[in-house]
Swiss-Prot record:
Its main location: cytoplasm. It catalyses: beta-nicotinamide D-ribonucleotide + ATP + H(+) = diphosphate + NAD(+). It comes from Halobacterium salinarum (strain ATCC 700922 / JCM 11081 / NRC-1) (Halobacterium halobium). This is Nicotinamide-nucleotide adenylyltransferase. Its EC number is 2.7.7.1. It is found in: Cytoplasm.
Length: 177
């Protein structure tokens, strides 16, 4: 049995993430989905809580025939111990999936096999673009699984993003508008 690990902020979980997991599902028996920056929420860059992102992912992946564990991973300010931190929070895994150069480097240094999954329609299937569309009232629902749009509606996520779009919690330009 092979268990994989795929990390992202998933702000929000979108169709590109879903397609990556669909590909990963052909290679592993189980998947640990790491919810990165788990302690951050209610800001322009990280509007959703870890719990809300767990709901998005769990509901969006319900039709997959894949055992999935969604695990919140808080940020560390010490990259040298990050892989140990991830391992301490997750079920054991044999292979990590990422396209982030730092994540790849850290897992390689820890002797963890890393596979780089294809990225899909990155010009629009990107969290910042989806959050910008939410802030501006443009179409974003077509870029996320229906289950994610339902979760965003349930938590008034668009209203939250529009509220924090002009300035972040520290009064700085959020970059969304």
């Amino acid at each position: 049995m092979t268990r994989g690990f795929y990390i992202g902020r998933f702000q929000p979980f979108h169709t590109g993430h879903r397609r990556v997991i669909e590909q990963i599902a052909t290679e592993v028996d189980e998947l640990v989905v790491g919810i990165g920056s788990a302690g951050d929420s209610h800001s322009a860059r990280n509007p959703f809580t870890a719990g809300e992102r767990i709901m998005m992912i769990t509901k969006a992946l319900v039709e997959f025939n894949l055992v999935t564990y969604a695990v919140p991973i808080e940020d560390l300010e010490r990259n040298a111990v990050w892989v140990s931190h991830v391992r301490s929070m997750c079920p054991k895994f044999e292979v990590a999936y990422s396209n982030n150069p730092l994540v790849i480097r850290l897992f390689n240094e820890a002797a963890v096999e890393v596979r780089q999954p294809p990225m899909y329609d990155r010009d629009v299937l990107e969290g910042a673009e989806i959050r910008r569309r939410m802030a501006d009232g443009d179409d974003w629902e077509s870029l996320v699984p229906d289950a994610v749009a339902d979760v965003v509606a349930e938590i008034d996520g668009v209203e939250r993003i529009q509220h924090v779009a002009d300035t972040d919690a520290n009064g700085h330009d959020s970059g969304l508008r």
